[in-house]
Amino acid sequence: ISMHVSFSLADAETLPFPDHSFDTVVSSLSSCTFPNPVRVFREMARVCRTGGRILLLEHGRSDYGWLGHWQDRHADKFAEALGCHWNREPLQLIEQGGLKVVRSRRTFLGIFHQIHASPP
């Protein structure tokens, strides 16, 4: 298989690509750092072709009550120190961004989300 690969440095909220440019969009452990994750997910939807795949590995607020509450108590300090908002709800943000969740699975005490989404 011959492939041409190129790399671009860009703002995730305003990607420099035409609509429907990609068959697959992949993002890993990044939405916690986006100032406006909903806008980023809208951009993913825009650049992914109709029928394409958006594959995400994200972390967020645990669905284990005690751990989710602990994350909430320490979220501000963690975000200030590391720029990571670790108690966001990835599935809600993805849907607010206009993506359709095809399949999702939570792992590691409900913190990690493996998500297959598609553009609307």
Give the label of every model feature segment.
Residues 8, 26, 55:
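Conserved Rossmann-like nucleotide-binding pocket used by diverse enzymes
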Residues 2-13:
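Conserved SAM-binding strand-loop segment of SAM-dependent methyltransferases
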Residues 13-25:
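A short acidic, Gly/Pro-enriched loop at the edge of an enzyme's catalytic core
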Residues 23-36:
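A short SAM/SAH-binding and catalytic strip from SAM-dependent methyltransferases
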Residues 38-50:
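A short glycine-rich, Lys/Arg-flanked "PGG" loop and its adjoining helix->strand segment in the class I
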Residues 2, 35, 49:
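Short conserved AdoMet
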Residues 114-120:
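C-terminal lobe and adjacent flexible extensions of AdoMet/dcAdoMet transferase-like proteins
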Residues 42, 55-114:
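C-terminal alpha-helical "lid/dimerization" subdomain adjacent to the S-adenosyl-L-methionine
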